[in-house]
């Protein structure tokens, strides 16, 4: 909210609000998670001012609720995100993404020789953490990649 208490992005009656998305990541989330494959209204705020982050993106999807699996898959791209469930214009639930053990159907294997790049199979990566480092291991070629390598693809 701004200092004059006006919303910069219109409130929704019922649905999901993904807040505290790093700036410039909102569109990527819409695409990767196929959030636009709905006939429901989607409101996007890009480069909004944020006290914590400087700038942030925001996504509001009416009449749609994310599964726990979807929320947790957001952790790769937006680990500080907050996912709010809205009902009758009120926040009725909040959750924070945490890295899942596997990420399915979202990422593309960066190995150009991987079968998943040419065959119609769903992508699947095991998530491995070593301290703060996140490695992703492709189910098909069994190669491990640093998080930033997979996300750049």
UniProtKB/Swiss-Prot annotation:
The keyword Zinc applies. Its cofactor is Zn(2+). Zn(2+) binds at residues 109, 114, 138, 141. GO terms for cellular component: aspartate carbamoyltransferase complex. InterPro entries: Asp_carbamoyltransf_reg_N (IPR020545), Asp_carbamoylTrfase_reg (IPR002801), Asp_carbamoyltrfase_reg_C (IPR020542), Asp_carbatrfase_reg_C_sf (IPR036792), Asp_carbatrfase_reg_N_sf (IPR036793). Binds 1 zinc ion per subunit. GO terms for molecular function: metal ion binding. Keywords: Metal-binding, Pyrimidine biosynthesis, Zinc. GO terms for biological process: 'de novo' pyrimidine nucleobase biosynthetic process; pyrimidine nucleotide biosynthetic process. It comes from the Bacteria. Belongs to the PyrI family. Contains catalytic and regulatory chains. Involved in allosteric regulation of aspartate carbamoyltransferase. This is Aspartate carbamoyltransferase regulatory chain. The lineage of its organism: Bacteria, Pseudomonadati, Pseudomonadota, Gammaproteobacteria, Enterobacterales.
